[in-house]
């Protein structure tokens, strides 16, 4: 999906709450890899962490994260692929999109025009079958006119919430399907992966027919979401890409475009998403990311962000069935 120019009115007709207008990404020349300075630390009378300098870069395209004391948690402290086990919620027969949209992704606000997005959207025709992402028990099947599951009554419209059989590190995991035209299951029913739980619609606060999918960890509430992109099982030969974009002070930069290029075609725009709008949205407990991209073919990529008039480019390798992680520090 290549979109170079967006019109606010057109985008609003596609997505829940609309999406930010991303500028035409700047075409790259031969990318220049920004060298990572070897940090030195001056000891003080009080105990301070001892940081191990990053090794000298090698020809490998896998970046070495530079650890900064101001960021918590540090990137990839444990294998991030540990919870890539949810199936695609859209039926393979669908004529619509089986990939989460990137123009109003998890953590977006549409430039501050809309509520912080706590899930991902799949644009599909009304009536498209929606499938269970995993085995689980239906704990909600109906609408949210009386019981609030989001910001307000009738926020999701017709919805289904599953408590999944499989837990993550002993913690309960929930999947929420919103804006359904029809609910096909009943509360208390057990479903298997791939079972149809509903049909795509636009009930509740929705513009255009689409599925809104959320992943909730620990508790079934609006404040316990995680980015579903980092829970979806990649297709064969694909992986997932995530990253963290930091400003000169080591703080996450909110809601800026992140552009991806294949390393073999550094001047050809491939895909684009954006960083999370605010720290109020939950990042992955392991990664601490502020952007993520699903269903990425295994290979080498260049990731570009632009802050002011300066561009920053970092390489990253995505391996099949795993999460590639890139950290971009926009220090001047």
Give residue ranges: language-model regions.
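Acidic, glycine-anchored pre-beta loop/turn
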Residues: 128, 183-195
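Short, acidic Ser/Thr/Gly-rich low-complexity loop/linker segments typical of extracellular
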Residues: 264-290
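Beta-strand-rich domain onsets/edges
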Residues: 114, 128, 204-207, 211-212, ...
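Hydrophobic core positions of the immunoglobulin-like beta-sandwich fold
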Residues: 177, 292-294
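Sec-dependent N-terminal signal peptides
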Residues: 1-23
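Ser/Thr-rich, Proline-interspersed low-complexity disordered segments
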Residues: 19-91
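Surface-exposed, glycine-biased beta-strand/turn segments
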Residues: 67-159, 163-167, 193, 202, ...
